[in-house]
Amino acid sequence: QVYGNKIKRLLVEGDKMNGTKGKMAEAFKELVCKKSFQKITISDIAKESAMTRENFYYHFRDKYDIMHWIFEQQVAAQLPEDEEPFEMWFNALFCNTCEDYKYYRKLIKSLSAEEIRSDLYPLFERRVRLLVQDCLDDSVWNLRKEKEDFSTAFFTDAFLGFYINYIRDHEEIDYNMLQIGLEFLFDKFLSTVRITKEESGEQK
């Protein structure tokens, strides 16, 4: 049933990308790869997609709206469910970004660091909080919420900063080397935290 629902969701998202909004999204991505985000106009997007400005405003408020929609459809919506390990989520984030790496890299280089961070922070913060909650054991009871909030903010900045900086600093993504690095990070550090939590639970 889980896989059936996932397949249905992917088909729905695919239909969205093949429709009018999808055509404008593809045109927008092409434009971003050719010129800076700041210089792209709604007329440019309409012309590139063989649509009208009216078509654009029927579906989107502005170019920031279409930018957010593309990320939501092609990256965020395709991420693993919350029940899956954080490692899988973070890996999938890069994997989904790979499909249009040049586009995302141009965006990150065109926009300010604060714009990118504010756009992506909620997505990262929510998923990192689940990771932190998974790692905290029952021995952490004094100021538990404060410690959870602190840890979430720390690791959100770490993972989000790495994601942004990696794309900005690498003209091409070496996915194999990235996977090796991430596997080492998660196996040597996160797995240790989880094992410690499990051992703590067994001793009770």
Feature-to-residue mapping (PLM):
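Hydrophobic alpha-helical segments that form the core
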Residues: 146-168, 173-189
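Short hydrophobic/aromatic patch on the recognition helix
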Residues: 50-60
